[in-house]
Swiss-Prot record:
One of its GO terms (cellular component) is ribonucleoprotein complex. Keywords: Ribonucleoprotein, Ribosomal protein, RNA-binding, rRNA-binding. This is Small ribosomal subunit protein bS6. Coiled coil: none annotated. InterPro entries: Ribosomal_bS6, Ribosomal_bS6_sf, Ribosomal_S6_plastid/chlpt, Transl_elong_EF1B/ribsomal_bS6. Pfam families: Ribosomal_S6.
Length: 91
C-alpha cells in the first residue's frame, strides 16, 4: 500500500454528488481515505471546455499502485471531473 494525494477540479453545480462518487470509486478499488480538504471554488487559469470556474478538492489516501491507472481512467470518464492529478506522497 502506498500513499497518494489526489487533487480534483470538479464542475460547479453538483459538487457534493461528485465528491461522493469519487469516494465510492476509491472504496471500489480498496483505497483507504486518510484525509480530505475542500479548497472551494476558484476561477480557472484557462477554460476547460466551457467551464471557467472549478471546485478544487484534495484527498489523501492509500492503496495499491496497480489500481491507480484504473482510478485515473474512471475519473476521465466522469463528466463532472474537469481535471485530476494523482501523485505519490512520501511516507
Amino acid at each position: 500500500m502506498r500513499n497518494y494525494e489526489i487533487t480534483n477540479i470538479l464542475r460547479e453545480g453538483n459538487v457534493e454528488e461528485t465528491k461522493s462518487a469519487v469516494k465510492e470509486l476509491l472504496s471500489k478499488y480498496n483505497f483507504t481515505i486518510q484525509g480530505e480538504e475542500d479548497w472551494g471554488s476558484k476561477r480557472l487559469w484557462h477554460p476547460v471546455g466551457q467551464d471557467e470556474q472549478g471546485h478544487f478538492t484534495l484527498i489523501k489516501c492509500s492503496g495499491s499502485p496497480t489500481e491507480v491507472a484504473k482510478i485515473e481512467h474512471e475519473f476521465k470518464l466522469n463528466v463532472n471531473i474537469l481535471k485530476t492529478l494523482v501523485i505519490r506522497a512520501n511516507g
